[in-house]
From Swiss-Prot:
Protein name: Apolipoprotein E
Primary location group: secreted
Chain spans, region Homooligomerization: 265-316
LDL and other lipoprotein receptors binding: annotated span: 157-167
Native source organism of the sequence: Ovis aries musimon (Mouflon)
Gene, per the UniProt record: APOE
């Protein structure tokens, strides 16, 4: 994206610095449109969209005239200038960081060229805004009249701008590719140099580690074996103690179970004796009550049979 902005703005400024009053007799056809498929680069796609916008401006339609009259084009250009300068500055800093592994002389030269290009870019964009303001005044003066002359001048200017735009963008792409290749080559050389410097240190560290492992490894193994045996003895001791406690708990449980069974037997015998005692208490009472009830019933029945039948009373 940063390469795209640099290519776009530099090429645009190169075309705008040309003479606006160039010869109109050169009516050569416009350069062919570049393909905008998925295989094309992002900057190529944006250049194509920019050229579509320029073609739209060239039509001098009602919308184009309206935007020229209300200074919308100049406002959008101002925003674009600010964003472009930010992108150029960020890209320059990033490229200088990538060129750090290169030689100091080369790095200083490239940095100086980039700073000079950035300064020229700011000056040229300011000039572009002034030219556009002047061109807007001409459009305002000619609106309502015949726009054929204005359209012809704009068509000629756009053809020249198109050529320079493509040429400068291609040149900038090649320059940036060279700088990027130099940065990559310098980075690879720097990494190789660092690797060569670190290789003896790594080998020395590996040798020391092997020696230290030989010297320290055996004592550590002996100590680990002693710890293992000590731990094994403690585990066995703990196991014996745990087994003794389990045996004692099992014995206590057996004693508790025996006592519970004994107490259960005693309670059962006491319950049976209490039941027999209750039976001996209540059985005579029940038999006596049964005899008394039978006698009472017998007396009632006898009284009913012996009573004379009397006629019913008249009062009834």
């Amino acid at each position: 994206m940063k390469v795209l902005w640099v290519a776009l703005v530099v090429a645009l400024l190169a075309g705008c610095q040309a003479d606006m009053e160039g010869e109109l007799g050169s009516e050569e056809p416009l350069p062919p449109e570049q393909p905008r498929g998925q295989d094309s680069q992002p900057w190529e796609q944006v250049l194509g969209r920019l050229w579509d916008y320029l073609r739209w401006v060239q039509t001098l339609s009602d919308q184009v005239q309206e935007e020229l009259l209300n200074t919308q084009v100049i406002q959008e250009l101002t925003v674009l200038m600010e964003e472009t300068m930010k992108e150029v500055k960020a890209y320059r800093e990033e490229l200088e960081g990538q060129l750090a592994p290169m030689a100091q002389e080369t790095q200083a030269r490239v940095s100086k060229e980039l700073q000079a290009a950035q300064a020229r870019l700011g000056s040229d964009m300011e000039d572009l805004r002034n030219r556009l303001a002047q061109y807007r005044s001409e459009v305002q003066a000619m609106l309502g009249q015949s726009t054929e002359e204005l359209r012809a001048r704009m068509a000629s200017h756009l053809r020249k701008l198109r050529k320079r735009l493509l040429r400068d963008a291609d040149d900038l792409k090649k320059r940036l590719a060279v700088y990027q290749a130099g940065a990559s080559e310098g980075a690879e050389r720097s990494v190789s140099a660092i690797r060569e410097r670190l290789r003896p240190l790594v080998e020395q560290s590996q040798s020391r580690a092997a020696t230290l492992s030989t010297q320290v490894g055996q004592p550590l193994l002996d100590r680990a074996e002693a710890w293992r045996q000590k731990l094994h003895g403690r585990l066995e001791e703990v196991g014996v103690r745990a087994q003794d406690r389990l045996d004692k708990m099992r014995q206590q449980l057996e004693e508790v179970r025996a006592k519970v069974e004994e107490q259960g037997s005693q309670i059962r015998l006491q319950a049976e004796a209490f039941q027999a005692r209750l039976r001996s208490w209540f059985e005579p009472l029940v038999e006596d009550m049964q005899r008394q009830w039978a006698g009472l019933v017998e007396k009632v029945q006898l009284a009913l049979h012996l009573s004379p039948t009397s006629p019913p009373s008249e009062n009834h």
